[in-house]
From Swiss-Prot:
Family stated for the protein in its record: Belongs to the universal ribosomal protein uL24 family.
GO molecular function: rRNA binding; structural constituent of ribosome
Pfam short name (any one): KOW
Organism in which the protein naturally occurs: Chlorobium phaeobacteroides (strain BS1)
Subunit and partners: Part of the 50S ribosomal subunit.
CDD domains: KOW_RPL26
Annotated protein name in UniProt: Large ribosomal subunit protein uL24
NCBIfam families: rplX_bact
Lineage: Bacteria, Pseudomonadati, Chlorobiota, Chlorobiia, Chlorobiales
Keywords per UniProt: Ribonucleoprotein, Ribosomal protein, RNA-binding, rRNA-binding
Listed GO biological process terms: translation
Domain of life: Bacteria
Function summary: One of two assembly initiator proteins, it binds directly to the 5'-end of the 23S rRNA, where it nucleates assembly of the 50S subunit. One of the proteins that surrounds the polypeptide exit tunnel on the outside of the subunit.
HAMAP family with a match to the protein in the record: Ribosomal_uL24_B
Length: 80
């Protein structure tokens, strides 16, 4: 009986330049910053920007609203 995580292969890798082919950011290009093969998702630079609320910390004494990239499905991008 095998246990563990199934190895998934994606068509893109970190540092590849990709074109978004579907979704709100369709037509944008960017560099792949991170790949999540198990979830079939990638983070692309400058694509799918969302606002994240951060609690007060030493680096942000009053808290903050930070804009950052969130993952998109790998089927929505292609190499360019």
């Amino acid at each position: 009986m095998k246990t563990g995580i199934k190895q998934v292969k994606l068509h893109v890798r970190k540092n590849d330049t990709v074109l978004v082919i579907a979704g709100n950011d369709k037509g944008k290009t960017g560099k792949v910053l991170r790949v999540f093969p198990q979830k079939n998702r990638v983070i692309v630079e400058g694509v799918n920007i969302r606002k994240r609320h951060v609690r007060p910390t030493q680096s942000h004494p009053q808290g903050a609203i930070i804009e950052r990239e969130f993952p998109i499905h790998a089927s929505n991008v292609k190499k360019s």
